[in-house]
Amino acid sequence: MTIEEVSGETPPSTPPSSSTPSPSSSTTNAAPLGSSVIPIVNKLQDIFAQLGSQSTIALPQVVVVGSQSSGKSSVLEALVGRDFLPRGNDICTRRPLVLQLLQTKSRANGGSDDEWGEFRHLPETRFYDFSEIRREIEAETNRLVGENKGVADTQIRLKISSPNVLNITLVDLPGITKVPVGDQPSDIEARIRTMILSYIKQDTCLILAVTPANTDLANSDALQIASIVDPDGHRTIGVITKLDIMDKGTDARKLLLGNVVPLRLGYVGVVNRCQEDILLNRTVKEALLAEEKFFRSHPVYHGLADRLGVPQLAKKLNQILVQHIKVLLPDLKSRISNALVATAKEHQSYGELTESRAGQGALLLNFLSKYCEAYSSLLEGKSEEMSTSELSGGARIHYIFQSIFVKSLEEVDPCEDLTDDDIRTAIQNATGPRSALFVPDVPFEVLVRRQISRLLDPSLQCARFIFEELIKISHRCMMNELQRFPVLRKRMDEVIGDFLREGLEPSEAMIGDIIDMEMDYINTSHPNFIGGTKAVEAAMHQVKSSRIPHPVARPKDTVEPDRTSSSTSQVKSRSFLGRQANGIVTDQGVVSADAEKAQPAANASDTRWGIPSIFRGGDTRAVTKDSLLNKPFSEAVEDMSHNLSMIYLKEPPAVLRPTETHSEQEAVEIQITKLLLRSYYDIVRKNIEDSVPKAIMHFLVNHTKRELHNVFIKKLYRENLFEEMLQEPDEIAVKRKRTQETLHVLQQAYRTLDELPLEADSVSAGMSKHQELLTSSKYSTSSSYSASPSTTRRSRRAGDQHQNGYGF
């Protein structure tokens, strides 16, 4: 059976016969399966080949893999029907060969010019002599990798047009070798495996795994490397070669049925030309006849007709590839469309070269205007490139105001750093040498001003945070576009940095003025201020609730003093102590009011209030005026009396502090002061939380939005700076050229896909057929490899397979 029989019908005048059709049977004009789909993909491959390794679009293709001398080249030549590949005992395929088989119509004269080959590196040359094609492959390989068995991953692209082939595209890769020869590196096996994996790892790739029948299939290099990327065997087709040289008594039936290593797409067995056939110049067509004769003479292979022979392999590859392409077409078109949009956008960012001054001025003005618009859009949250994964632009400014600045101020307790002794000291210092009947205003104002001044640093820090955010926003604007002009980018960064610093100064000055205004006028008439009466009531309540009374045990022989006398004594004592430096004492000690209560009432009535009363001792007696006037005694008595009247004071220390113990009245005064501080601090804090963001927005943020464009025009729009600022680095010119080429290729590819006829657009049908292929049981048909009428009809009706699925 020949390829011609598979691809078309015999003339109607030829009746069905049980004899084998002759190899010269002509093809009909019926379009073979995938007559338009595969050529379109071939055209896409040629288009994307212009980009070389830069292409990121993976196209559907069939990749041939196998170990060295496994028969890959023989299979490819059998599919073409001509000798055209380099041959030898050593490695022959040293560069990937992309082989596009294109079926053409047979000419009436049947001349030798019906078949020809074209290399992509020689687009204007047609090779009608296939031996010349072999020599060109060898020459092109040697031009790149030398003549001493080196390998490379640069493709050789060959298109063969012939009426005797089916539309198939295959990629022949170097065979897997174990031992380096010639100038091959020591890691030649790893390099070849890496090259193979780079092709077959794509889901768009079908794998044609070639394994000789005289080796163990479980140890097949081709199947092993295919299983790495296709472990389930969904896109791997097995080819068993050299069936004619298996040991006597053995056959490949179990292998072909998939009983050893199952593959979803099945196996095909073929017979290769031996070295003797090549030496005797036997043609491929003669080898196909010999292959057919071999399978006829082996009854073990009867019933496996659809799994035997090169013609069946060609038909199977054609059908699987067509349906594979149809399944992938929607995604392929989508990927090309997305790549086209992305490349067009990138190319647009590089712009066009402008050499005239007028053009340069217009270009610069356009850049400055777009930059200011992008800057404002980021601040206002209207940018199209706004991130969805994090806060950016103006949202970060709002976060700094509310979640950092305001929250930090609200967490501050104005009395946190003030102890009760600090407040008591401030109160006593404010009274001077006098005793205060009420809590004085001065200590409250001093303490509240001190707390207000603490708000200056966080307010200035907030302004600095906003300044840094504005700098970050300026760096994010038009990042890709300004990569084209690094000098302009640098100048713009300098201008906007200086401009923002100029806006930061009045912002900080205004913040300082706001704090100064709050400190200069303490408005105790504010409606939200707690006020004196409420503060006293709250303080009394807090003091009473915090103190638990403890009864004092009195001695049994102590006479309870008169309540009126005791009360009067307490008032006098308090008044006196108030007059004595407001209760500030040194280490001499203080006589408390309780000590006065312990004195008898008679002594209290006879004793005068004065300095001696502070230092009451156990043996000390009061010296009256009459005793001083009585002088009947001797001089010694007078000296003793004089000495008794002398009171020596210790000098006060350098640092004076209030006493550690304080009265209930002092506790109330401290609580009142704290309440007043907290109440007024809350008022000022709210004012600062409102005024500081307003000052920053006015003097820094909004001022930048309003005036940035004018500043750019003033600083940068100068004719003598045009050429310097619009100078491009060399890499930009290279990128512009590369993206322009890529854009042209993608546009060609997109137009090529639009040329697909209705056959290629039947995606749903193609997908269903592809699923049918994966689950088909037709691989196990019982028809024999013979010239039975049923087999002949199936061969002749290959053109109907387009409508009836795969029909293997």
From Swiss-Prot:
CDD domains the record matches: DLP_1
Segments forming domain Dynamin-type G: 56-330
Keyword terms, alphabetized: Cell cycle, Cell division, GTP-binding, Hydrolase, Mitochondrion, Motor protein, Nucleotide-binding, Peroxisome, Peroxisome biogenesis
Binding site for GTP: 66-73, 172-176, 241-244
Region called G4 motif, residue ranges: 241-244
GO terms under biological process: cell division; peroxisome organization
InterPro entries, sorted: Dynamin (IPR022812), Dynamin_GTPase (IPR001401), Dynamin_GTPase_CS (IPR019762), Dynamin_N (IPR045063), Dynamin_stalk (IPR000375), G_DYNAMIN_dom (IPR030381), GED (IPR003130), GED_dom (IPR020850)
GED domain segment(s): 670-761
Record note on disruption phenotype: Reduced plant growth. Increase in the size of peroxisomes and decrease in the number of peroxisomes per cell. Elongated mitochondria.
Main localization category: mitochondrion
Ranges annotated as spanning the membrane: none
Entry comment describing in which tissues the protein is expressed: Ubiquitous. Preferentially expressed in flowers.
Gene3D superfamilies reported for this sequence: Dynamin, middle domain, P-loop containing nucleotide triphosphate hydrolases
Self-association state and partner proteins as the record states: Homooligomer. Interacts with ARC5 on peroxisomes and ELM1 on mitochondria.
Similarity comment: Belongs to the TRAFAC class dynamin-like GTPase superfamily. Dynamin/Fzo/YdjA family.
This protein's name: Dynamin-related protein 3A
Gene of this entry: DRP3A
